[in-house]
Amino acid sequence: MGLSDGEWQSVLNVWGKVEADLAGHGQEILIRLFTAHPETLEKFDKFKNLKTPDEMKASEDLKKHGVTVLTALGGILKKKGHHEAEIKPLAQSHATKHKIPVKYLEFISEAIIHVLQSKHPGDFGADAQGAMNKALELFRNDIAAKYKELGFQG
């Protein structure tokens, strides 16, 4: 399940492009998540009232949350699978406070892949997509394992 050095390099290469515009990428990823899976909006009191992509685009709170999400994910990706210290508090908050099911992490992973494909087609070919999918699956599996330890049936 682990990634090779080359795969991690591919992941971090495209992630550098994400970090160049965290707000733009984060906003686009969350809009994609919320429009493709409207049920995910119910987990966000701040965003429940946003019904259209235009309303979502106009929300500064949504933009800020996108930065928060991608900053945390970037920190995890840069650990190249050695992310225990980063995963533990994230799993704790998402299991006990936010009650985010693992399925929703799959949905946001799909949104990340989609947005990276559309924004960076030259840097996100099949190999890079495969590597990113593996990295996101590793992240989800480790979150799911922590959820289980916490007794959360997410």
Curated annotation (Swiss-Prot):
It is found in: Cytoplasm, Sarcoplasm. The keyword Metal-binding applies. Its main location: cytoplasm. One of its GO terms (biological process) is removal of superoxide radicals. InterPro entries: Globin, Globin-like_sf, Myoglobin. Nitrite binds at H65. It comes from the Eukaryota. It catalyses: Fe(III)-heme b-[protein] + nitric oxide + H2O = Fe(II)-heme b-[protein] + nitrite + 2 H(+); H2O2 + AH2 = A + 2 H2O. Belongs to the globin family. Monomeric. This is Myoglobin. It comes from Perodicticus potto edwarsi (Potto). The gene is MB.
